[in-house]
Amino acid sequence: YIQLGRQEGGVVLTGGTAAEAPVDDVPSEGAFLRPTVIEGLSYTARTATEEIFGPVVTLHAFNSEQEAIDMANATQYGLAGSVWTADAERGHAFAQRMDTGIVWVNTWLNRDLRTPFGGVKQSGVGREGGAWSLNFFSELTNICVQQP
């Protein structure tokens, strides 16, 4: 995705290269990538709209709250999002307009395991967490028996 981001016109501000291991006593086996920040992409670019399960973020400027909502929702995915603001009430209202399974306001990865977690659109396959897990990890079978 980093190479694709460059091909799509993005500029890597930091990261984008392999990290040398071991780092902080992490074994040397494995793939390690430095956290990467990319700017200069269209908000419709693949690098900006696809789920990258790695330490990569894209930056996008906006001129209005509605433009920011449109950008956030202009993807076929919707696993999670975050809003950072000095006005928590406004952040909550903004989060309600986002098409994502979970939105963090002024925090990240803060979650009560008793609540459901999962994406919308093409993200995830349902909800896990709390009572929802029983359905998420179960397969129902309807059995009809004719009594003699």
Residue spans for each PLM region:
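General beta-strand structural signal in soluble alpha/beta enzymes
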Residues: 12-15, 105-107
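Conserved C-terminal structural/oligomerization subdomain of aldehyde/semialdehyde dehydrogenase
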Residues: 25-148
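Alpha-helical packing segments of well-folded alpha/beta enzyme cores
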Residues: 1-2
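Short, solvent-exposed loop/turn elements at beta->coil junctions and helix N-caps
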Residues: 16-25
